[in-house]
Amino acid sequence: MTFRLIAENRKARFNYEIIEKIEAGIVLQGTEVKSIRAGKMTLADSYAVVNREELYWLNGQIAHYEHGNIHNHEPFRSRKLLLRHKEISRLIGLVKEKGLSIIPLRAYWKGSKVKLELGIAKGKKLYDKRATTKERDWQREKQRILKTNH
């Protein structure tokens, strides 16, 4: 199977500590698929919630299809995510007991299907974000020093 990246949530790894990753399918309408093929999908500020034993992706944007008609889709509608019932039950336990969040990390094509890589995540505090930034800056500086010495 080939994996072609559609969109990535770059802020997710900065704002959250990713504990576990899972793959989920998405229930889409026809114009949404066409819009995704045109690269009009955004994962920023979106999340997943469990509602009545089903998993939904909220606040994710798939822009209007340019060549669509009056039956075009709603860009910010909630979309059902496809997982096995056993996996959803496990997610319910993690979210309720430990206070974790479910956030999309990236969207990609797997064959002809659109898949979301979800992260079970814990929010970082401000000082954790500062430490991450400091560590990243130090790694860049270290690489720069090593380059100039060789």
From Swiss-Prot:
Q: Note the superkingdom of the native organism.
A: Bacteria
- Kindly report the protein's main subcellular placement as a broad class: cytoplasm
Q: Does the keyword Membrane apply?
A: no
For this protein, the record's PROSITE patterns field holds: SSRP
Sorted alphabetically, the Gene Ontology BP terms of this entry are: trans-translation
Q: Which GO terms describe its cellular component?
A: cytosol
Keywords annotated in UniProt: Cytoplasm, RNA-binding
One Pfam annotation reads: SmpB
InterPro entries xrefs: SmpB, SsrA-bd_prot, SsrA-bd_prot_CS
The molecular function terms in GO held by this entry are: RNA binding
Location in the cell reads:
Cytoplasm
The protein's role, per its UniProt record? Required for rescue of stalled ribosomes mediated by trans-translation. Binds to transfer-messenger RNA (tmRNA), required for stable association of tmRNA with ribosomes. tmRNA and SmpB together mimic tRNA shape, replacing the anticodon stem-loop with SmpB. tmRNA is encoded by the ssrA gene; the 2 termini fold to resemble tRNA(Ala) and it encodes a 'tag peptide', a short internal open reading frame. During trans-translation Ala-aminoacylated tmRNA acts like a tRNA, entering the A-site of stalled ribosomes, displacing the stalled mRNA.
The cross-references to NCBIfam families, in alphabetical order and at most eight, read: PRK05422.1, smpB
Question: What's this protein's family per the entry?
Answer: Belongs to the SmpB family.
- The protein, known as: SsrA-binding protein
Organism of origin is Magnetococcus marinus (strain ATCC BAA-1437 / JCM 17883 / MC-1)
Which gene name does the record give?
Answer: smpB
